[in-house]
Regions:
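Active-site glycine/GP-rich loop and adjacent strand/helix microenvironment
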Residues: 9-25, 139-408
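Acidic/glycine-enriched edge-of-secondary-structure segments
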Residues: 84-97, 133-142, 163-167
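Conserved AMP-binding loop of ANL adenylate-forming enzymes
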Residues: 107-143
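Nucleotide 5′-phosphate-binding alpha/beta core
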Residues: 5, 9-108, 112-113, 252, ...
């Protein structure tokens, strides 16, 4: 069902245990998983016997055996789509109904068969666009596959087709609304939104309230699909019923007590074709005690609370320290120290790459253009470059310094 069933304690559900055992049996036939799955799993608590599988592990495994590192249980012909996400990581999906499970999030946000949905997630390379397209189809919504570019045209289309619902990152909707207002385009039919892929800053949330837009957030990844979703504002996020979610001490297998902040670890139970067991998201969150006031009885988490490592999300894209190193290595033979500064001004995320480099101004101008191009190529994001004196960057181990204020 789209509405969560009665679930009880997260580590005691018997139907989860049955699904987990089936998932593990499939995964044991895959060589790279078999070593992780030697211990017998008789309870959900026994999951801690299985080592956490990290995104960095997945990148290296796939690199050695493209495209999926031989981690798929079934042949590629049985899958529907292949995607390539930053990392790079290859993802895929199957033909099963609600494969990514985002229909639950849309349903909780009030979307239905009366809605015209402007889907502003990308439809190319990465799975986000298809994730929400699939979800909206299940709810019988009418979908405009907009993607995440050209805000002027987005505003025009939103007015002409009488869009009632938006899915995408929060900042982009604000830009579209402002474009519509500046061009006297009526968009009064827009009443609801479901956000993911980027933080909802307090000032932006207040802006949407002032426009009488009912908005909700959901939390998911390209590797895992839906992890959790809001069913009511300020009530945390309901964990999707087809996953097992654990909160552990970052970098370990050890669970933390409910209420303590730690790293989100996910096992996906409904997709046997590509077994995902104890996958470390690199995200921080915490389990909220008690039941949701909406009546949904699955456990809740506070939502996305930052990164367990220095990886950060900017304009819907993950940026990793290894990518910063690659930019520098591709252009500099002496591998100077570099630090990426992520800031926010005028409701927009900004990137500035600081590089310790001494040369004449003409060399710096030419090199600046090359670095900007390399940032766009590797990060899929625009940014600026600033060359600084040797030894001026602090010796704090930070490659990415996120200065944005995420609020409480």
């Amino acid at each position: 069902t789209l509405r969560s069933r009665g679930l009880g304690d997260v580590y005691k559900r018997q139907d989860h245990l049955v699904s987990l055992k089936k998932l593990i049996e499939n995964a044991k036939t895959i060589t790279l998983h078999s070593d992780r799955l030697k211990n017998e799993i008789s309870t959900l608590t026994d999951l801690q016997k299985i080592d956490v599988f990290r995104k960095s592990d997945l990148i290296e495994i796939q690199k050695k055996n493209l495209p999926f590192g031989n981690l798929n249980f079934t042949e590629l012909s049985e899958f529907s789509h292949i995607y390539r996400s930053p990392g790079p990581i290859y993802d895929l999906d199957g033909y099963g109904n609600n494969w990514w499970r985002f229909a639950r999030a849309l349903n909780a946000a009030g979307f239905n068969n009366k809605d015209i949905v402007q889907n502003c997630f990308s439809y190319h390379f990465t799975p986000a666009g298809m994730m929400f397209d699939e979800a909206a189809k299940i709810l019988k919504c009418t979908i405009f596959p907009a993607g995440g570019e050209n805000s002027d045209m987005q505003a025009e289309i939103m007015s002409e087709i009488n869009t009632t619902g938006y899915v995408g990152i929060p900042d982009f909707l604000k830009i579209i609304i402002e474009k519509a207002e500046n061009n006297d385009l009526p968009i009064s039919n827009l009443k609801k939104a479901l956000f993911s892929g980027g933080p909802l800053f307090p000032d932006v949330a207040e802006y949407f309230k002032s426009k009488n837009i009912n908005f909700y957030q959901c939390y998911g990844t390209a590797d895992l699909g839906l992890i959790a979703y809001e069913a009511d504002i300020n009530d945390g996020m309901i964990v999707d019923e087809d996953i097992i979610l654990e909160i552990v001490k970052p970098g370990t297998n050890e669970r933390v007590p409910n209420g303590e902040v730690g790293e989100v670890i996910v096992t996906v139970l409904n997709n046997y074709e590509l077994p995902i067991i104890r996958f470390a998201t690199g995200d921080l969150s915490t389990i909220i005690e008690g039941q949701s006031k909406t009546g949904r009885t699955n456990i809740r988490i506070k939502g996305w609370m930052g990164r367990a490592d220095q990886t950060t999300k900017v304009r819907g894209m993950f940026v990793q320290p290894s990518q910063i190193a690659k930019i520098v290595d591709n252009l500099f033979t002496n591998k100077p120290k570099a630090k990426l500064i992520v800031s926010r001004e005028n409701n927009r995320d900004n990137l500035k790459l600081l590089i310790e480099y001494v040369s004449n101004e003409n060399d710096k101008i030419a090199l600046n253009e090359k670095v900007v191009d390399e940032m766009k190529k590797i990060l899929n994001l625009n940014g600026i470059v600033e060359f600084v004196n040797l030894g001026s960057l602090p010796n704090d181990g930070k490659v990415i310094d996120d200065l944005r204020d995420f609020g409480d």
